[in-house]
Structure formats: structure tokens, C-alpha cells
Amino acid sequence: MKVIFLKDVKGKGKKGEIKNVPDGYANNFLLKQGLAAEATNSSMKTLDAQKRKEEKDAAAEVENAKELKETLEKLTVEVKAKSGEGGRLFGSITSKQIVDVMQKSHKIKLDKRKFEMDDAIRALGYTNVNVKLHPQVTATVKVHVSEQ
């Protein structure tokens, strides 16, 4: 029997795959558990439409990430902090503080976990920080730390 897998089934198939499986296995397990649906013409058309919609959504998501990347790379985030001798900061600048400043001054809301910082910023001056907007899109934000 030809079935369309609705969920991943270990050793049999992944979600969205169309495979031939034994009739008994399909009727008694896959269909009853809701793991698969019988592959009819209408269900195949529905699956194709769903796949096209997912591809379109993924392409739109990448496009939005690229637009945001262009915006982020044009701006400089100004962060003020107290510093001591030699430009060393009292404390450090974390991704959370950068996100807060971006929210207030540029009205751009990002998740702090998207910032790829090896370590917090501990000195005055300019620093480039990578932001992972999408698995395929990474932007670089210029952060300027100045004295308060």
C-alpha cells in the first residue's frame, strides 16, 4: 500500500515521503496511529501544494533576513559605559545590552541569542559583532562603546 508519512517513523520514512509499505502494517499501525495517510490522488495534490507553500515561506524568510542584514550592516550601535584607565570598562557590554540599545534607538528587535560573541566587550572603541539572522544569513553589526 502506498502511504504518505505525516510524521517521521524510525526506519520507515520521514514526514512528507511517499512509500510502499505492507498493507497490514499500514492499516493496523500507521493509519491508526495517525503517522501516515493513504496516498490517493487528492492527498498527493495536497502534499504537493503544502511542499510548495513551505518552500515559498522559506524563501520569504531568507529574503526578510537578507533585508534585515542590509539594514543592520549600515548602522552603528552606540553603547555608553563607565571606563577606567586605558579604556578598560568597569564590567562589560553583553549581547543583552546591545539588543536593548538597538530596541531603543533603532526600533529593531532581535533575540540576544542570535548574537555570536565569543566574549563580552570589555574595552572602549569599535567592535564588529556577528548576528546569525538565519542559518544562511549572517550580518555584522558595528558596536561603538564610548565613555559615559
From Swiss-Prot:
UniProt entry keywords in alphabetical sequence: Ribonucleoprotein, Ribosomal protein, RNA-binding, rRNA-binding
Gene3D superfamilies reported for this sequence: Ribosomal protein L9, C-terminal domain, Ribosomal protein L9, N-terminal domain
PROSITE patterns from the UniProt entry: RIBOSOMAL_L9
InterPro entries in the cross-refs: Ribosomal_bL9, Ribosomal_bL9/RNase_H1_N, Ribosomal_bL9_bac/chp, Ribosomal_bL9_C, Ribosomal_bL9_C_sf, Ribosomal_bL9_N, Ribosomal_bL9_N_sf
Assigned GO CC terms: ribonucleoprotein complex; ribosome
Domain of life from the UniProt record: Bacteria
GO BP of this protein: translation
Keyword Ribosomal protein (UniProt): yes
Molecular functions per Gene Ontology: rRNA binding; structural constituent of ribosome
Keyword match DNA-binding: no
HAMAP family per record: Ribosomal_bL9
NCBIfam families for the chain: L9
Function: Binds to the 23S rRNA.
Family: Belongs to the bacterial ribosomal protein bL9 family.
Listed name of the protein: Large ribosomal subunit protein bL9
